[in-house]
Amino acid sequence: MEFLPVAPDHDVLDCRLPSRQTAPVVVASPHSGSVYPAAFLAQAAVSLAALRRAEDAFVDELFATAPALGMPFLAARFPRSYVDANRESYELDPGMFEGPLPRPLNHRTTRVAAGLGMIPRVAASGEAIYRGRVPSAEIEQRLETCWRPYHTALSMLIEQTHRMFGSALLVDAHSMPSSASGMGLRERDHRVDIVLGDNHGESCAADLVDCAERWLSARGLRVQRNQPYAGGFSTQRYGSPGLGRHALQIEINRALYMDEARHEKLPTASVVERLMAGLLEEIGDQARTMLLPRPLAAE
């Protein structure tokens, strides 16, 4: 299938709302975007195919039933290699940029050290994305046109959900390369199908994570928690169980649903789509009962 990048100045988000929200759940996909600005491609020292390897390809399609299940759904249309919405706003490598920086950058993180800040320095292959330094003015430009609209919309959906139900759960949907699915395992020939990330117990009620793990395991999927992915910026920012705000990151092994080399869906993608629909339905049912608002203390 021919892939044609486009460069719109708007419409950077895909936001789909249910006709009526019936579950305290918001589903988001920050890394499935595939709209590549032409100016970005002109800056790139690597091929479009190399850039696309960073995408959580087709994840927005795997979770597309969310609105039909009464859950808002948000996906970034901009690509992760251009702006990573699962990073802090100024989590950046200052050495990438030319010109005065807008403010001090948070550059002392393991993600920045790996070249994977809000504006990534390297592609999935480890190759440098850019031919030279990036004009520092692009930091604010990309924040204003991509990062801020995404998090403004996501924050609004979560806050509306919390006001409606007294609690809210963010399901942060991702995929992982099959090469990463054995990381952290003692037996290297065993691969993980799903990684559930709750920031090591800090971002989501344990009962909900237990429920998701049981449901997936009962269907023959190999599930692991927090290894190698415990959750990124969104999980940490939006997961505060003590405040009735929960966040659970779900990583799906790409080999389950796509040919990673050809960047194409496999026939099994429809099976994974049905599984994710079933998981969302189960999570929604459980969230309605598990995430009841706490009664106010007597005065």
Listing of model-derived features with the role each one plays in the protein:
Residues 1-170, 175-248, 252-299:
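N-terminal catalytic or cofactor-binding beta/alpha core of small enzyme domains
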